[in-house]
Amino acid sequence: MRKVSKQRDRNGIVRLQLNNKNYFHFGPLDQGWWPDGLYTAPTDEALLYDIQKTKDWGYNMIRKHVKVEPARWYTHCDRIGILVWQDMPNGDKSPHWDMRNYFSGNENVRSAESEAIYRKEWKDIMDFLYSYPSIAVWVPFNEAWGQFETEKAAEWTKTYDPSRLVNPASGGNHRPCGD
């Protein structure tokens, strides 16, 4: 159906690929807010309209930020040909930002209960969305919100679904892991 991968070019620069061809992911961050329903779209047509407009404006992907949409949204992305970077919605503690420091070794610490909830919810999201080919990149942490044990989360995500790329914390603290 589709293959998402990465490959170094002749200059050593990592390029994202779709079906073994370089494919620059270009798209907006979409929080999925609706003026008359906050997180719930008023109609299926409204879901479709937003995705189609994104494509019409020249984008080829959407970073789904802070929420998981209903199944119809992903079905529309599949049909229209929009890739999705799916974030894990915010969780636990406020972000701890490591400004201009790509890895200090410091990360948030969660309670055992919070860790278990995170892991269950992330697995449930991945299971729910697994069959949608539009999902190209899993993002275990939205920015730095609740970011903890980043390398373990990225490795688990990659092992659980090796058919997709992993961006450990899109817009968050960089760690030496993921794709």
Predicted regions and their residues:
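Secreted/periplasmic carbohydrate-active enzymes, especially glycoside hydrolases
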Residues: M1-H76, I80-G81, A136-V137, A153-T159
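Substrate-binding/catalytic cleft of secreted carbohydrate-active enzymes
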Residues: M61-D179
